[in-house]
């Protein structure tokens, strides 16, 4: 059945009553997902690193905009909790970097299978936190944040949270 993912068309097939010869079964019956989890680790680390780069860009734009956008006669950096929002974004980016570094090191030292707990943790945490940071940057920009004048809306579209229930189980 066709589906639309982002701006690309994909095809999803489903099979009923399929028989797989015993010699073609990987790891054992019902363990196919397990082998894919082990092999997907490096790609997940890469995706998390790219997402953190988007959060870094959003923070950069947020800091710049908070000093130039004026409301009630003051830069918005001096209003409300905007400085706290910026500070929290910096802290969360640093925490994400350390968590991804820990996951990557675990893959190098322990191997992909044993590192899967670390990889699953960053795969669940990073996209969610990155979306929150990009959203905060959009809020600080006002309507400009969702326009084509900044990369923020596009970054948010391409940083979708993963199916966390799978990563956390």
State each model region's role.
Residues 23, 30-33, 38-160, 164:
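Alpha-helical interface subdomain recognition
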Residues 3-5, 11, 16, 33, ...:
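Residue-level marker of intrinsically disordered, low-complexity segments enriched
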Residues 1-6, 11, 158-169:
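Single conserved hydrophobic/aromatic residue that forms the stacking wall/gate
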């Amino acid at each position: 059945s066709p589906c639309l993912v982002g701006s690309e068309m994909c095809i999803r097939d489903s099979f009923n009553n399929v028989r797989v010869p015993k010699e073609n079964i990987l790891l054992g019956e019902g363990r196919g997902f397990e082998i894919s989890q082990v092999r997907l680790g490096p790609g997940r680390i890469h995706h998390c690193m790219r997402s953190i780069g988007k959060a870094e860009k959003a923070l950069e734009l947020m800091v710049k905009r908070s000093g130039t956008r004026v409301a009630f006669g003051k830069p918005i950096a001096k209003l409300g909790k905007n400085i706290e929002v910026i500070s929290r974004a910096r802290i969360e980016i640093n925490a994400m970097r350390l968590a991804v570094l820990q996951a990557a090191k675990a893959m190098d030292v322990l191997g992909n299978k044993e590192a899967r707990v670390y990889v699953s943790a960053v795969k669940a945490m990073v996209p969610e936190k990155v979306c929150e940071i990009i959203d905060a940057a959009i809020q600080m920009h006002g309507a400009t944040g969702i326009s084509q004048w900044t990369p923020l809306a596009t970054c948010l579209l391409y940083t979708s949270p993963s199916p966390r229930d799978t990563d956390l189980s």
